[in-house]
């Protein structure tokens, strides 16, 4: 029997991150986030080796990552958390999955706590 010579075509995975909420408040810069992803994504074990395998585009309040190489949503979440920590935004903004391969940055829900001192007085 002859060996199968047909190769599988690489399927492009698309990940979208909606950064509209923190961008509207002026605490988040989508352009610097996209640049951070470009500078830190590893392809085949090397940083800065994107080539044609991974493309990162920033379109207003949406950052899109298209990959034909091995890339996961968990890795995108890891890099985003690292970016938020570096810019001291990790305490206020979180990375939330909305659908498969669709994410958004959202502020933590803060519930006002009543001071016990005011109740006692």
Swiss-Prot record:
One of its GO terms (biological process) is cytoplasmic translation. It is found in: Cytoplasm. Its main location: cytoplasm. GO terms for cellular component: cytosol; cytosolic large ribosomal subunit. The keyword Cytoplasm applies. Pfam families: Ribosomal_L22e (PF01776). Disulfide bonds: none annotated. InterPro entries: Ribosomal_eL22, Ribosomal_eL22_sf. GO terms for molecular function: RNA binding; structural constituent of ribosome. The keyword Cytoplasm applies. Gene3D superfamilies: 3.30.1360.210. Keywords: Cytoplasm, Ribonucleoprotein, Ribosomal protein. It comes from the Eukaryota. Present with 60400 molecules/cell in log phase SD medium. There are 2 genes for eL22 in yeast. PANTHER family: 60S RIBOSOMAL PROTEIN L22 (PTHR10064), LARGE RIBOSOMAL SUBUNIT PROTEIN EL22A-RELATED (PTHR10064:SF31). Component of the large ribosomal subunit (LSU). Mature yeast ribosomes consist of a small (40S) and a large (60S) subunit. The 40S small subunit contains 1 molecule of ribosomal RNA (18S rRNA) and 33 different proteins (encoded by 57 genes). The large 60S subunit contains 3 rRNA molecules (25S, 5.8S and 5S rRNA) and 46 different proteins (encoded by 81 genes). Belongs to the eukaryotic ribosomal protein eL22 family. Component of the ribosome, a large ribonucleoprotein complex responsible for the synthesis of proteins in the cell. The small ribosomal subunit (SSU) binds messenger RNAs (mRNAs) and translates the encoded message by selecting cognate aminoacyl-transfer RNA (tRNA) molecules. The large subunit (LSU) contains the ribosomal catalytic site termed the peptidyl transferase center (PTC), which catalyzes the formation of peptide bonds, thereby polymerizing the amino acids delivered by tRNAs into a polypeptide chain. This is Large ribosomal subunit protein eL22A. It comes from Saccharomyces cerevisiae (strain ATCC 204508 / S288c) (Baker's yeast). The lineage of its organism: Eukaryota, Fungi, Dikarya, Ascomycota, Saccharomycotina. The gene is RPL22A.
């Amino acid at each position: 029997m002859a060996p199968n010579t047909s190769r599988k075509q690489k399927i492009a995975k698309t990940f979208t991150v909606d950064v509209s909420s923190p961008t509207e408040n002026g605490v988040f810069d989508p352009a610097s986030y996209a640049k951070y992803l470009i500078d830190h994504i590893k392809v085949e074990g090397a940083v800065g080796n994107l080539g044609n395998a991974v493309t990162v585009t920033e379109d207003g309040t949406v950052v899109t990552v298209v990959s034909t190489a091995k890339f996961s949503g968990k890795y995108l979440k890891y890099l985003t958390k690292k970016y938020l920590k570096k810019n001291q935004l990790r305490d206020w903004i979180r990375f939330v999955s909305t659908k498969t391969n669709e994410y958004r940055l959202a502020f933590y829900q803060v519930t006002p706590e009543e001071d016990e001192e005011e109740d006692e007085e």
